[in-house]
């Protein structure tokens, strides 16, 4: 079970940092770019930063998948203040009990991602394609935690590959991809999953 300790949400060991408190402003920035509306699906609750920001928008419903028992209980307590929120104790990418959605936000931590989740090179690409094919309405928007290790050339290559993968896997859809570098000077030195200069806020708009 995950454990909240100091400024970090840890997984099965201290090497698995699920989330940290410094992410609050980054999460809020991603959600503000997404501008949630209609029915929203969020993968992962963590500290609830993105969930709370989603609730600031005029949404119809807000479904959150959270598999960890401790974080799930925290999410249930949080949801008492937000009648549009529905918490499902379920691990991504299981899509049982899910409907169709207008907006998606993806930030799970998967300690042992299997070959299926990594078939496109990273879990974010799998998330996009899975949702577009099975869960998205005709017009939909997506954002996710995006840390690209390296310089701007690597960032360009990452999003070029993402676009090529989308066009190959979902050829009948139209896409608009926007990405902005995030001022990540507040990332602490003991964070082991990203660092200053690696964070981006993506927005993918889809019509199908």
Which sequence ranges carry the predicted segments?
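Class I SAM-dependent methyltransferase Rossmann-like catalytic core
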Residues: 1-37, 49-52
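Class I S-adenosyl-L-methionine
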Residues: 14-17, 150-208
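Class I SAM-dependent methyltransferase core
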Residues: 42-46
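Conserved beta-strand signature within the Rossmann-like core of class I S-adenosyl-L-methionine
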Residues: 139-147
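S-adenosyl-L-methionine
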Residues: 67-98, 111
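A short glycine-rich, Lys/Arg-flanked "PGG" loop and its adjoining helix->strand segment in the class I
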Residues: 118-138
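Conserved SAM-binding loop of SAM-dependent methyltransferases across substrates and taxa
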Residues: 47-59
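Conserved SAM-binding motif I beta-strand of class I
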Residues: 61-66, 144
């Amino acid at each position: 079970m995950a454990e909240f300790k100091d400024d970090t949400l840890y997984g099965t060991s201290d090497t698995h940092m699920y989330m940290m408190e410094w992410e609050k402003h980054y999460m809020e920035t991603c959600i503000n770019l997404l501008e949630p509306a209609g029915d929203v699906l969020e993968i992962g609750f963590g500290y609830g930063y993105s969930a709370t920001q989603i609730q600031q928008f005029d949404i119809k419903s807000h479904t959150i998948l959270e598999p960890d028992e401790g974080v799930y209980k925290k999410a249930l307590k949080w949801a008492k203040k937000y009648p549009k929120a529905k918490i499902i104790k379920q691990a991504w990418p299981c899509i049982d009990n899910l409907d169709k959605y207008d907006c998606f936000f993806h930030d799970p931590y998967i300690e042992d991602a299997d070959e299926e989740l990594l078939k496109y090179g990273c879990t974010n690409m799998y998330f996009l394609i899975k949702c577009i094919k099975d869960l998205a309405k005709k017009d939909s928007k997506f954002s996710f935690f995006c840390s690209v290790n390296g310089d701007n050339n690597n960032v360009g290559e990452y999003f070029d590959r993402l676009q090529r993968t989308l066009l190959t896997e979902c050829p009948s859809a139209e896409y608009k991809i926007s990405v902005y570098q995030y001022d990540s000077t507040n990332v602490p030195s003991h964070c082991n999953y990203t660092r200053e200069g690696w964070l981006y806020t993506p927005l993918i708009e889809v019509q199908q």
